[in-house]
């Protein structure tokens, strides 16, 4: 059976849409009529996906990490209960409240019922199920332990979401503070300063240097503020476009890695992802070289990716994993020692997991320390700027009071 998306009218003339399974479009139309619906459009999901791909869509946005973790966890639980895979996919699709996810799962189930493996069926949605996900599912299907593999994938997605949530929560306060500070300074320069200082200019009073500087800044902001904002947005767009060029992105990422604080954070994030992903791959009986290739895909820094791919080539030529990674000079000594211990004891999976946990904790600690320093410094800078504006605005008034008191 195939999956079809339909648009129909009910007895009251209201539009309805959804996903239904059937052998062909005619059968689906008949089933809709039996439900007192007038079919307006019935399209097989695979045909619709092909149309969408030609137009540049078809799940290119993917789905959120929490949604992926949820459907993976639900599927793992149902597979563990002994239900046939087709019924598990149907149940998860019916439980989903989001039409996009429901449509995707029904289409995946349709391919599974046609005889395709689950990993092949998921391959139609590469922006939702990445290579790590599909490779592990394929390994689970071959080994007969699909349920445990899905559980590990759900844990992996949930851990990534937790780390992302912690980082986002830590960044909320500084970002709000920056926006608030910029807003206050812009308001003072654009609205308050011209009205107060302008009175002294009209009186012909000589202004202190700080006040004159403030007035010039206010005039510049009023005349060129919008152009400056547009230019800034264009610059951001240009930088993002340039970073899509592989050679420029590689040089940029190499520079990022060499920075004092940001570089340490970037190394910690990428090495932790590598260790955790490789741990999951080895636990799913994926060969070490294939696991390294999959782990590289989840890393975000192109320079780190390049170095790890070179390390994978060294492993292929017979080097140990520890020595190959040590040559990159990107992995912390503790992680390298734990990997060496895992190779010698045959417990590489467990040691990689512990190394990833340690690196995650170190990453979180580094971020907290950096934000702990940055936030007070930002508050002090904001207070200094506001104080400068207030004092520069009040200085002509104080000078006038001194002249009048003499």
From Swiss-Prot:
Pfam families: T2SSF (PF00482). Keywords: Calcium, Cell inner membrane, Cell membrane, Membrane, Metal-binding, Protein transport, Transmembrane, Transmembrane helix, Transport. It is a multi-pass membrane protein. InterPro entries: GspF/PilC, T2SS_GspF, T2SS_GspF/T4SS_PilC_CS, T2SS_GspF_dom, T2SS_GspF_sf. Its main location: membrane. It is found in: Cell inner membrane. The keyword Iron does not apply. Residues 193-223, 390-406 are periplasmic. It comes from the Bacteria. One of its GO terms (molecular function) is metal ion binding. Ca(2+) binds at residues 97, 151, 155. Residues 1-171, 245-368 are cytoplasmic. GO terms for biological process: protein secretion by the type II secretion system. The keyword Transcription does not apply. One of its GO terms (cellular component) is plasma membrane. Coiled coil: none annotated. PANTHER family: GENERAL SECRETION PATHWAY PROTEIN, TYPE II SECRETION SYSTEM PROTEIN F-RELATED. Belongs to the GSP F family. Type II secretion system is composed of four main components: the outer membrane complex, the inner membrane complex, the cytoplasmic secretion ATPase and the periplasm-spanning pseudopilus. Homodimer. Interacts with EpsE/GspE and EpsL/GspL components. Component of the type II secretion system inner membrane complex required for the energy-dependent secretion of extracellular factors such as proteases and toxins from the periplasm. This is Type II secretion system protein F. The lineage of its organism: Bacteria, Pseudomonadati, Pseudomonadota, Gammaproteobacteria, Vibrionales.
């Amino acid at each position: 059976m195939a999956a079809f998306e339909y648009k129909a009218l009910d007895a009251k003339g209201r539009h309805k849409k959804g996903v239904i399974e059937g052998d062909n479009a005619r059968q689906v139309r008949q089933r809709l009529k039996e439900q007192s619906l007038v079919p307006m459009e019935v399209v097989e999901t695979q045909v619709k996906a092909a149309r969408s791909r030609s137009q540049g869509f078809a799940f290119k946005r993917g789905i959120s990490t929490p949604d992926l973790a949820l459907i993976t966890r639900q599927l793992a639980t149902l597979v563990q209960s002994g239900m046939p895979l087709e019924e598990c996919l149907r149940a998860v699709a019916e439980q989903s409240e989001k039409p996009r996810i429901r449509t995707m799962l029904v289409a995946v189930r349709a391919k599974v019922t046609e005889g395709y493996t689950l990993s092949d069926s998921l391959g139609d949605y590469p922006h939702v199920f990445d290579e790590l996900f599909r490779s592990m599912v394929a390994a689970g299907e071959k080994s007969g332990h699909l349920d445990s593999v899905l559980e590990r994938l759900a844990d992996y997605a949930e851990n990534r979401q937790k780390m992302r949530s912690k980082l986002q929560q830590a960044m909320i306060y500084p970002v709000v503070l920056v926006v608030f500070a910029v807003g206050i300074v812009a308001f003072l320069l654009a609205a308050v300063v011209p009205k107060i200082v302008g009175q002294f200019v009209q009186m012909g009073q000589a202004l202190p240097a700080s006040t004159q500087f403030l007035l010039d800044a206010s005039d510049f902001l009023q005349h060129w503020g919008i152009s400056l904002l547009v230019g800034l947005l264009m610059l951001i767009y240009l930088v993002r476009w340039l970073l899509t060029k592989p050679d420029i992105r590689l040089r940029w990422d190499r520079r990022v890695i060499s920075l004092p604080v940001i570089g340490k954070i970037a190394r910690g994030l990428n090495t932790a992802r590598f260790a955790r992903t490789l741990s999951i791959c080895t636990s799913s009986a994926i060969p070490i070289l294939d696991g390294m290739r999959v782990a590289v895909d989840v890393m975000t820094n192109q320079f780190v990716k390049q170095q790890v791919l070179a390390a994978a080539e060294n492993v292929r030529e017979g080097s140990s994993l520890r020595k190959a990674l040590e040559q990159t000079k990107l992995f912390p000594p503790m992680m390298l020692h734990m990997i060496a211990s895992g190779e010698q004891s045959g417990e590489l999976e467990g040691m990689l997991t512990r190394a990833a946990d340690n690196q995650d904790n170190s990453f979180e600690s580094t971020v907290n320390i950096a934000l702990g320093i940055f936030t007070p410094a930002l508050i002090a800078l904001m207070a200094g700027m506001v104080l400068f504006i207030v004092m520069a605005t009040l200085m002509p008034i104080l000078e006038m009071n001194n002249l009048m008191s003499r």
